[in-house]
Curated annotation (Swiss-Prot):
The lineage of its organism: Bacteria, Pseudomonadati, Pseudomonadota, Gammaproteobacteria, Pseudomonadales. Orotate binds at F34, F35, T128, R156. It comes from Pseudomonas syringae pv. tomato (strain ATCC BAA-871 / DC3000). Keywords: Glycosyltransferase, Magnesium, Pyrimidine biosynthesis, Transferase. The gene is pyrE. GO terms for molecular function: magnesium ion binding; orotate phosphoribosyltransferase activity. It is an enzyme of class 2 (transferase). This is Orotate phosphoribosyltransferase.
Length: 213
C-alpha cells in the first residue's frame, strides 16, 4: 500500500465517509462497512480529496487528454482532480461534465467545460451497478471521443448477481481499466494495522469471503 492510500483511508474514516458497523445496501446485503463520498463536503476536504485522486491518476499511468465528471457526484470530483493535477503535478488538463438535462438556451447542449475530445478519463466516487458508467460511455461515443479509463475512490471488490463485480463487467464490456484510490483489500490491511479499528476486521473479512471477487 502506498503512503497516499493509507492517508486516504485515514482521511475517509476521520471525515465519517468510511464507517464500520451494520449497514443495509441497496442490493439488500448487510454490509459491515459503508462509504459515503458525499461527506467530503467542505472546501478543505474537497481540496484534499482532489489531491488523492490526482495521486491515483499519476500512479495509474493512464494516458488521457481530458477529465470527465458525470453529473452529479462526478462534477466536483473531476474539478478537484483537475485543480490538484495542475497545482501539485504540473499537469494543466481540461475537464468537462454533463448536464442531466440538455439546455436549449445560452450555450445550449448537455456538456459544460472543455470539449469532450480525444482520450477521456472518467472520474467518479464508486461503481455500484455500472449503470451510470454505461450512460457516460454513450456520451463519450456521441462526441467521437474515446474512454481511456475510469478512476473511482473505492473498489469494493464485490460481485454483483453473477460471478463478476460491476467493475469487472465494465472492464470486460468496454475494454478499459477501472482504477481506484484504494480497494477493499487495502482497507483490510489498514484495519489489521490499527489497534482501535482492528475489532471490525473479522466482520469485514467475513463479508469479503461471502461476496468478494
Amino acid at each position: 500500500m502506498q503512503a497516499y492510500q493509507r492517508d486516504f483511508i485515514r482521511f475517509a474514516i476521520d471525515r465519517g465517509v468510511l464507517r464500520f458497523g451494520e449497514f443495509t445496501l441497496k442490493s439488500g446485503r448487510t454490509s459491515p462497512y459503508f462509504f459515503n463520498a458525499g461527506l467530503f463536503n467542505t472546501g478543505s476536504a474537497l481540496a484534499q480529496l482532489g489531491r488523492f485522486y490526482a495521486a491515483a491518476v499519476v500512479e495509474s499511468g493512464i494516458r488521457f487528454d481530458v477529465l470527465f465528471g458525470p453529473a452529479y457526484k462526478g462534477i466536483p470530483l473531476a474539478s478537484a482532480t483537475a485543480v490538484a493535477l495542475a497545482e501539485h503535478h504540473d499537469r494543466d488538463l481540461p475537464w468537462c461534465f454533463n448536464r442531466k438535462e440538455a439546455k436549449a438556451h445560452g450555450e445550449g447542449g448537455s456538456l459544460v467545460g472543455s470539449p469532450l475530445a480525444g482520450n477521456v478519463l472518467i472520474i467518479d466516487d464508486v461503481i455500484t451497478a455500472g449503470t451510470a458508467i454505461r450512460e457516460v460511455m454513450q456520451i463519450i461515443k456521441d462526441q467521437d471521443a474515446t474512454a481511456a479509463g475510469v478512476l473511482i475512490a473505492l473498489n469494493r471488490q464485490e460481485r454483483g448477481n453473477g460471478e463478476l463485480s460491476a467493475i469487472q463487467e465494465v472492464e470486460r464490456d468496454f475494454g478499459i481499466p477501472v482504477v481506484s484510490i484504494v480497494s477493499l483489500n487495502q482497507v483490510l490491511e489498514f484495519l489489521a494495522d490499527d489497534e482501535q479499528l482492528k475489532q471490525h476486521l473479522p466482520a469485514v473479512e467475513a463479508y469479503r469471503a461471502q461476496y468478494g471477487i
